[in-house]
Amino acid sequence: MKYQNIIDNMTLKEKAAFLSGKSEWQTRDFPRLDIPAIFCSDGPNGVRKQAGAGDHLGINPAVPATCFPTAAAMANSWDEELEQRVGVALGEESMEEDVNVLLGPGLNIKRNPLCGRNFEYFSEDPYLSGKMAAAFIRGVQSTGAAACAKHFAVNSQELRRMAMNAVVDERTLREIYLTGFEIAIKEGGAKTVMSSYNEVNGVYANENEHLLKDILRDEWGFEGSVITDWGASNDHSLGVKNGSTLEMPTPGLDAARELLASVESGKISEKDIDERVDELLDLVLTTTENAKHYKKVADKKALHEEHHKLARLACENSAVLLKNEDGILPVGAKVQAAVIGDFAFDPRYQGAGSSMVNSTKVDSIKDMLETSGISVTGIVRGYQRDGKEDEAMKKEAVDLARRSDVVLFFFGLNEKSETEGLDRKHLRIPQNQINLIQELAKANANMIGIISAGSVIEMPWHHHFKALLHTALMGQAGAGAVLDILSGKVNPSGKLAETYIKKYEDTPSYNYYPSQERNSEYREGIYVGYRYFDTAGVPVNYPFGYGLSYTTFEYDNLQVKPDGATFTLRNTGKYDGAEIAQLYVGLPGAKVFRPVKELKGFLKVFLKAGEEKTVTIKFDDKTFRYWNMKTNKWEVEGGVYSIMIGASCADIRLQDSLAIIGTTEVMPYYTNRVSSYVEGKIQQVGNEEYETILGHSIPDGSWSGELGMNDALCQMYYAKSGIARFICKKLGEKLKKSEAAGIPDLNTLFQYNMPFRAIAKMTGGMVSMEMVEGLLKVVNGHFSGLGKVISGFFRNQKLNKQYEKDLEEQK
């Protein structure tokens, strides 16, 4: 071990206490051993360091920081170099604020568009997610801070996220949900990984030996620290034994006592603890040493201004032009434009929850119009942000549209639509916005829509627009970038990192999401996003990888060799611009079922008008592989592969073939037993087929019997105790009230969906697991549990004081 000399000088009590947090954001320090505390902070798109009382939900204010476009937007740039620059800026702001570990990026695969936190994640594709995450991590860690890849793994719904079991087959786990993390670890060099709240195949992620030990540490060679999501620890001892390093936030010393008892009983060994202590020491001592050598800026305001410019550049490169009929964009200087939409006054530029940033400043369309070069007839809100109809506002907007040449309509999802802790109920934008679109289109045929939405929306109204610019959640400097695109100063170059479907019912996981019981069944398998839509022939509004430009690009001269594909790319239009060339690979007639094509490489290429470049996209170890569940290893199926170069997954410009020698000797499936998967008819997968790819029977996910430690508080609806049912009812009423007000109550949402054990994990040591056991007895109708709660309280206080005293005496 790297720090054996320090470990030898630590008592077992010190080592046990070291492996859980000291406070909401800090690790425990030991001055006598020169072990300082380090500070963690949320920050996938901006540093959220709370100056006062800490919370993990973004409720209390944080110090000012630059709010960059969210991961959903950055992924649309397909620009690894730009993502790395953003990572550097986030790392710099972390170091300026004495943040040692930045809790990002988020690599969750966008399995289903209803997930309330999709704005925080990159893509439906693991390869793109992994490449962008690796760039982010390299940038952050180049400054001396540590990045934290999250949430590991298979975490795709907010509903009961702490009490949900993801039932997923090994092939899908490897190919879809872990590949991005593999790239982030191997190519990005992430120093920390955050374990997710949920169970994976019946074992909580934070204590899952298969995930943490077999794959993360043994296969990928990860030597860093695994940090729990806040309150995600279930069995702290098993977590430590199986590869989890640090439990956060502070569970008090109950967690430390749990480790001591487990060593005494033989459940774990002191060696298990020493290994985790060594990992955490490396993180603590390395990042604090880096902080000593980091030279802080003399003028933080100047640094923030520099980063504001970078945030604007990031938006410029990630906005996606979905539609541009009649070349209506860019807007000419003499064209009189009506600017309509509440988002033009107050931009919707970030999501809610733990990633919410206290921005250094926020640009708005309204404030920047004067210098935009766009001639404006007027600017009005047009609709109420909370979704309420307002006829006076609508009439004002329609009148303005009628006397203008074009309409610039700013719209999309409001704040309550996208937030941590709450999944969306549908994919529609607010109805009052749809009604206004219809009225505006009657008044003016030249409609240009600017969409702010961190995740997929249905677009039954898109035919009303001649042009659509999708900005996702564009960060604090997005307004200037958008106006530069609309006026033609900037040529849009973003492409979609997720498929924009026609209707939610087309989603492959539609029948299984979100899970209303304990199990979340991933029956769709590897057919996530475009992998399904392409294979099943389901029409979509805008496909994965799609995005227009003000110029045009020509692909030619494809040459495929064993190590990659080379082709020429020419800008045939009048504007300078960037094209994102995409490499897809498929195997016609494959014996092992697979999507018709999968992304295996990409490159963003800038070309001046008329310029031509030779482009090469290399193959790598992931180009032809699949996971064989029978041999339990990566294999290659032999055959003649289609090598496709496209402007999107639906726009293949060049194609050739390449014969590959396979490694498969044992087939993973009998084709006749998985016909729905072979044909891509995922929404009709039956139990027998699902069990075939799982390799075992479907576990029982129904709720029954008395409530236990890992049942969510919302399940008190079924409790025997009338008091418990009353509390559950009140929590539900509180949520409905906040929803009606348009302001999600994140704290209540967290409580509603958290399991009983989290009461001990999230109360800073005030509540012990013994007390929760007593509380559960009460909930289950046994009022004798009240005595256990009371006696447990006093026992917990006494034991905590004694433990603190023992630690103090070591000083």
Describe the residue ranges of each PLM region:
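Glycoside hydrolase catalytic-domain context in secreted enzymes
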Residues: 1-622, 626, 640-644, 649, ...
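Generic surface-pattern signal
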Residues: 8, 12, 24, 264, ...
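Terminal connector regions
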Residues: 621-668
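Charged, amphipathic alpha-helical linkers/stalks
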Residues: 649, 655-726
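Long, charged, low-complexity terminal extensions
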Residues: 702-759
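C-terminal non-catalytic accessory extensions
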Residues: 739-811
